Amino acid sequence: WFYQPYNIHAPAVMFDRTNHIDNYPDYFADSVAITSVKSTLLTDIYQEELNTPAYVSLEMKVDMDAATRQLSIDISGEKVLPIADEDSVRINVWLTEDSLYTEEQRGVSGGYYHRHSLRRCLTSTWGDKIDVSQPFSLHLTTELPANWREERMNAVAFVACRDAEDKNSCRVLNACQERVAMMPL
């Protein structure tokens, strides 16, 4: 959905689901929020996003019961800056895993280790609607399959706007991540 139908490429990058065409028209010429990782301006775009304030606070606590592989996630936050369309705000919670090895990866010869690979979406695809007119909280639980390496996993939460008609109106308002389990010594 974020790509143009004729231009799907990897590797690619997206910063906060934001189209930077006003400042970087040559790199966002398709009016989408995605550009190639070969862009020479990635550092500039990254710095611009680092300077963008968070519109909501976001805190997350992750607990895992190693015996049952049951994961418990508690998230809380509140609006800290005005948001144009508060009715469109949603929270997304994902589980990711690092160091997933594959021998086949287009554009790479030999093996390749994937980082931040999406393992499970704990909310609906486009996030669960939240009311940011007051402090919000969310409690989620899930069981990790035995073949997932919890020491390589993160819980990622982000709050974003959602506009089903305009892909450039889905800005991320804040994000956080926590490790699922500590690496063994």
State each model region's role:
Residues W1-L185:
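Short, conserved sequence motifs used for protein processing/export or organelle targeting and
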